[in-house]
Regions:
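N-terminal beta1-alpha1 cap of cysteine-dependent amidohydrolase-like domains
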Residues: 1-113, 124-126, 131, 135-164, ...
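Conserved G/P- and acidic residue-centered "switch" motifs that form tight phosphate/ATP-binding loops
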Residues: 116
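Hydrophobic, aromatic-enriched interface-forming segments
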Residues: 119-121
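Active-site-proximal beta-strand elements of phosphoester/diester hydrolases
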Residues: 210-215
Length: 234
């Protein structure tokens, strides 16, 4: 019998109340599109609920790649800022858990893809900072038009960098965020921008695969980012 060598891809999860059947209870969950894209790319999705940070290294040792998913604001104290009046509630234990996962992944040189909050977490962990309320800079809510509604922004990409080498020079992307990168973290290079100047993607060229995007590729039909992550595990 041939062994199954499909790579295991960890997916960080939301913690929120959820309802199913007769139950309404706290749950660890993630939109199924994340898992669908990983599976289609040839990987096996592994959900990673919030855990003890001292378990992160053991978890990472069993994975072949990591996706840092979207979610709530990161605690401003983690990048040396006071909370903005428009900052939204953070989950300190999720910040701690995912920081530990990311640092263990970096130590192991595991391929990492950050999505929305995931890009912001990578930036903060590498010493960068965030704009806490993008409408103050962008002059509107085009990046997050309404609850439950994705905005669409046109972005310009550097085709000599990731993810532009995968997606091309210009593309419309779905987004839902009110924060964004301010100062880039150590080693990070911006590689995509919205028309209003918002950094929409960044990567660390010296790493095997360390890429973050501010938009939500899981709701697009183009699987290129997930395919590239899974390919990088080989």
């Amino acid at each position: 019998m041939m062994s199954d060598v499909r790579p295991l891809i960890g997916l960080t999860a939301y913690r929120t109340h959820a309802a199913w059947g007769v139950w309404h209870t706290p749950a660890a969950l993630l939109p199924h599109a994340y898992a669908d894209h990983v599976t289609a790319a040839g990987g096996v999705p592994v959900l990673l609920p919030i855990g003890a940070d001292d378990a992160a290294q053991a978890v990472i040792s069993r994975l072949d790649g990591l996706i840092l998913s979207g979610g709530p604001d990161i605690e401003p104290v983690r990048y040396g800022a006071a909370p903005d009046p428009f900052a939204e509630r953070s989950q300190a234990d999720r910040d701690t858990w995912e920081t530990a996962l990311l640092m263990a992944a970096l130590q192991a040189d595991l391929p990492v893809l950050g999505i929305c909050r995931g890009l912001q977490l990578i930036n903060v962990c590498l010493g960068g900072t965030l704009h806490q309320h993008l409408p103050d800079l962008a002059g509107g809510e085009r990046h997050r038009p309404a609850p439950g509604v994705y905005g669409t922004v046109r972005i310009r990409l550097d085709t000599d960098a990731l993810p532009g080498s995968l997606l091309g020079e210009g593309v419309d992307v779905p987004c839902h965020h009110h924060q964004a990168i301010d100062r880039l973290g150590s080693g990070m290079v911006a590689s995509a921008w919205a028309q209003d100047g918002t950094i929409e993607a960044a990567w660390v060229p010296r790493r095997r695969f360390l890429v973050g995007v501010q938009w939500h590729p899981e709701v697009r039909d183009d699987p290129a980012l997930f395919t590239a992550l899974v390919k990088a595990t080989g």
